[in-house]
Amino acid sequence: MGGKGGKGGKGLGKVGAKKRHRRVIRENIQGITKPAIRRLARRGGVKRTLSGLVYDETRNVLKVFLENVVRDAVTYTEHARRKTVTALDVVYALKRQG
């Protein structure tokens, strides 16, 4: 009955174990700095300076895009009955976005 040892995979865990608390993160989108957005624009082919309103709009669009990618990646993971999101899940989610 050897087995590999280690923790069990799909069990319920310890009796009476607490659920892991997930920290609520707010305003992390401001971590996408103005110079970072400018570099992305340069890489995308923009040559002129950007208007001040562009930065907030870019942050909002990026946030929505990433939320959709993460949602799709998690959906792929759940469908495969896994708990870990793999790089392939993210690749498939990105391909689905277009």
UniProtKB/Swiss-Prot annotation:
CDD domains per record: HFD_H4
UniProt biased composition (Gly residues): 1-14
Segments for region (Disordered): 1-20
Gene Ontology MF term list: DNA binding; protein heterodimerization activity; structural constituent of chromatin
Keywords in alphabetical order: Chromosome, DNA-binding, Nucleosome core, Nucleus
Record-annotated disulphide pairs: none
Organism domain of life: Eukaryota
Location (main, coarse): nucleus
Gene3D superfamilies the record matches: Histone, subunit A
Cellular localisation: Nucleus; Chromosome
Entry GO terms, CC: nucleosome; nucleus
Pfam families linked to this entry: CENP-T_C
Family the UniProt entry places it in: Belongs to the histone H4 family.
Assembly mode: The nucleosome is a histone octamer containing two molecules each of H2A, H2B, H3 and H4 assembled in one H3-H4 heterotetramer and two H2A-H2B heterodimers. The octamer wraps approximately 147 bp of DNA.
Function of the protein: Core component of nucleosome. Nucleosomes wrap and compact DNA into chromatin, limiting DNA accessibility to the cellular machineries which require DNA as a template. Histones thereby play a central role in transcription regulation, DNA repair, DNA replication and chromosomal stability. DNA accessibility is regulated via a complex set of post-translational modifications of histones, also called histone code, and nucleosome remodeling.
Name this protein carries in UniProt: Histone H4-1
Taxonomic source organism: Blepharisma japonicum
